[in-house]
C-alpha cells in the first residue's frame, strides 16, 4: 500500500511539472520561442494592463517618443513573446526575451522616430506574437500628431 501511494505521488508530481522546462526569467532562443508558440499545450492567457490604443499627443517632427504597454500573464503556463514587429520602419519595438511566469507582469516598448514623417496625425501599430489563447497575435496601436 505504501509503495502504491509512493508511485501515485511521484506520478502526480511528474504530471504537475510538465511544461515547466521553460524557466521564467531565463532568456530563450528563437527556436524555443517558435516551439512554444506552435504547441497549444503551452498556451496561456494575457491581460493588457494599459489600453492597447494610446494617444501620445503632439510630437515635433524629428522627435523620438517611446510608448509602453504593460501586460500580465493571467494563465497557468509561462508566457513567451515570440516576436514583436511594427507596421513601418519608423517604429522600433523592443521584444522581451525571457518567459513570464503565471502572474508575472512585463512591458512591451516601442520607439517612434518622427524624423522625415509628414505632418499631421500618424497611426502606428505594434504586433505582438505570443503563446496565448484565444489569439496569438495582439495589435497595439498608438497615435501621434506630428507638428513643425
Regions found by a protein language model. Give the residues of each.
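C-terminal motif of bacterial Sec signal peptides marking the signal peptidase cleavage site
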Residues: 13-16
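Surface-exposed binding patches on compact interaction domains or structured appendages
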Residues: 76-102
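Asparagine-centered strand-capping/turn motif at beta-strand->loop junctions
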Residues: 71-75
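Positively charged n-region of N-terminal signal peptides that target proteins for export
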Residues: 1-4
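Short, surface-exposed loop/turn segments at beta-strand-coil junctions that are enriched for proline
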Residues: 113-119
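Beta-sheet-dominated interaction scaffolds and their linkers
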Residues: 22, 28-68, 146-148
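Terminal connector regions
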Residues: 23-24, 120-147
